[in-house]
């Protein structure tokens, strides 16, 4: 995972995401309902649900809305028949792309996902074609703090790895099941958590140039525009120099 900055590579997408907040809320509620259905409504015992709640709160969703979604999931309402489906493929520049979807109609979902790859010079692969390049991890972002103190607190809490970033922030990696407990330990030590989520971390990355990077971003945007797509993971690496040209 050395050198990989997942957060740096998504900053440029924040504005586009904010512009479609209604769609984001729909996806967040869908994830809350599904997480509660699968793992129960106790946030402390359900890492997926806690991650979904944290993400919803960071997008300014109200507690009432979150609680209603959880109640629907636990109660088994009409909208809880969603299933998680992962699609794998190759994007511009040979990048590996994983698309996490929640859907009650696989045919509808694939009819949205496949053309996105095709239009951007990529292709949808078979199950397992790129999945082996990713590991499911918990990822915590700390905006600033004393490195030694954070390292001690994170290790004590059960973190796997702590990586300082050039801007003074820190990325803390955990087993995905331990995300909540590690987060609690770091917060108890006095550090402010900027973001925390369960994500997919690539074992290797592909450096993208100024010609290829926009094509990958176009693919990501097209996929995230699909109603059934919850998350898009990739192993493309965009340097600060290339990002400045976009």
Curated annotation (Swiss-Prot):
SUPFAM superfamilies reported for this sequence: YebC-like
Signal peptide interval: none
GO CC list: cytosol
Pfam family, one: Transcrip_reg
Compartments reported by the entry: Cytoplasm
Molecular function in Gene Ontology: DNA binding
Keyword Glycosyltransferase applies: no
Protein name: Probable transcriptional regulatory protein APJL_1171
Annotated source species: Actinobacillus pleuropneumoniae serotype 3 (strain JL03)
